[in-house]
A protein has these predicted regions:
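Ligand-binding clefts of soluble mixed alpha/beta catalytic domains
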Residues: 1-479
């Protein structure tokens, strides 16, 4: 790395992200091409973006880092072309692209030249989607048309204090100003829109990206994410049954060495998504959650066990990513139905359809563990046998059926007294809602003790390692 790159924030971020001494800069001599509005008199070293390649824990990655000291990091024609060139090289080599964003927007002096070059970058990103992992980190401003860049990538991180992400500025939204709701903040973009996967300090973000890169395959055909497992494959998870409410904790218990890389942690907390390791293999995990516990074992948030529109879309996008990169999927199902609210009713049917389609369309190994309730169409949506799960396990106290047994008894025996309803509810639960009943019908493969979950899911994924599954010939789905 040249002195220019090493001495400013953009270069320091690259040095902190990559293995020491591994970065090689490309296009360091490029400058702005336009001469309009006296641009030739302005210094534009590297045209405001450092581009090149290096390694993270030995894995090849391509990186671009915007330099806010050059025209405030504003994007011009050559700036965008440099990033596009990095994408071309990454696609040839089958390696991830990481973008470190700190930008004031498009250069007005370059107008359509900048727009054309940046439009081509959108196209490069679109073609790279599902082929190589794309990761964005926002350290400064990412506004207007640039906000499409993180939306086109797979994972986005945002500096908690200085990061700003918006399509329209908060003050440009009718009836709003930044004092009412800072729609550009890391909190809003991570908790409300779900566009941001993680927030924190600059150091935290770079560390999270390093961890994520090590969990992911380098492209959709080759997988360098496998590693030796030193954890006991048959390890008993004695307290796993007590963690079924907060499945982020449950997934941590199941994983090799308790490694869990959660994504979109602050968004739609009723649904958990992230990556775990099972026998050294990266597995994508999707799980319903009814409670969120903090490090002091205190309840931070509580949900009713239903599937929300936001949660369904969050899970659907994650499953589609896993399928694109041949990452097996594990689900922990504990769902009582669909969330009933005016907000959810606007989108729940479409959101549930997207999740159903994502599971049904995925050809990767899919394993489901029913850890609690599994009622109605929401259960079917959550990676059931019906939509394509390869293996389904259930804990002994799971309930699988149309609805809660008490509700079913009240509907079927509406005129009966309370004692009769209790009797019929117990009968209904035994005949229609027990895991044994589902297993007799072939909807559950094996009833397992909660403590043995780790060894069973590892065994299932080992068995499914060479899975091959065909799909009807078509250009693409339309859900």
């Amino acid at each position: 790395m040249g002195n220019m790159a090493a001495d400013n924030a953009a270069g320091k971020r690259i040095n902190s992200l990559l293995d020491a001494g591994s970065f090689v800069e490309i296009g360091g001599a490029v400058t702005a091409r336009t001469t309009d509005f006296n641009m030739q008199e302005k210094e534009t070293p590297a045209d405001g973006v450092i581009t090149g390649y290096g390694v993270i824990d030995g894995n090849l990655v391509y990186v671009y880092s915007q330099d806010a000291t050059v025209l405030n990091g504003a994007i011009g024609e050559m700036h965008a072309k440099k990033i596009s060139n990095i994408y071309d090289m990454a696609m040839k080599m089958g390696a991830p692209v990481i973008g470190l964003v700190d930008c004031a927007g498009f250069r007005l002096q370059e107008a359509t030249d900048a727009l054309e070059a940046f439009g081509k970058l959108y196209q490069k990103q679109s073609m790279a989607s599902g082929v190589i992992p794309q990761i964005t980190a926002i350290f400064g401003t990412c506004g207007g048309g640039l906000s499409i860049v993180p939306a086109l990538t797979d994972f986005t991180f945002m500096e908690a204090k200085n990061g700003k992400l918006f399509t329209n500025t908060p003050n440009a939204i009718p009836g709003n100003d930044i004092s009412k709701c800072d729609t550009s903040s890391a909190v809003f973009q991570s908790e409300t829109t779900g566009l941001v996967d993680g927030t924190g300090s600059e150091e935290d973000i770079l560390a999270d990206i390093r961890s994520l890169v090590c969990m992911l395959p380098c492209n959709n055909e080759e997988d360098s994410s496998y590693e030796e497992c030193n954890d006991d494959l048959n390890r008993v998870c004695a307290d796993l049954a007590n963690a079924k409410e907060d499945t982020a904790i449950a997934l941590t218990m199941i994983s090799d060495d308790n490694i869990f890389c959660e994504v979109k942690k602050a968004y739609a907390k009723d649904m958990v998504t992230g990556f775990i390791k099972l026998n050294g293999m990266t597995v994508g995990a999707v799980a319903n959650r009814s409670k969120v516990y903090n490090e002091e074992a205190e309840v931070e948030a509580e949900f009713d066990g239903s599937l929300s529109a936001d949660g369904a879309e969050k899970a659907a996008e994650f499953v589609q990513f896993c399928d694109a990169f041949n990452i097996p999927v594990l689900t922990l199902t504990n769902v009582s139905g669909f969330t009933a609210s005016k907000y959810d009713e606007k989108r729940i049917a479409k959101s549930a359809a997207k999740l159903t389609y994502a599971f049904a369309d995925a050809t990767v190994p899919k394993v489901n563990v029913v850890i609690g309730k599994a009622f109605g169409s929401a259960y079917v949506t959550m990676n059931s046998k019906a939509v394509g799960a390869d293996m389904v396990y259930a804990w002994p106290d799971a309930e699988i059926g149309m609805m809660d047994a008490n509700q079913a008894a009240k509907i079927m025996y509406a005129d009966a007294d309370a004692a009769t309803i209790r009797e019929k509810a117990a009968e209904y639960k035994n005949l229609q809602s027990s895991p044994l009943s589902a297993a007799k019908r072939g909807y559950v493969d094996t009833i397992i003790e909660a403590a043995d979950t780790r060894k069973y899911v590892i065994g299932a994924f080992e068995m499914l390692f060479t899975k091959r599954e065909d799909r009807p010939a078509k250009k693409h789905g339309t859900v």
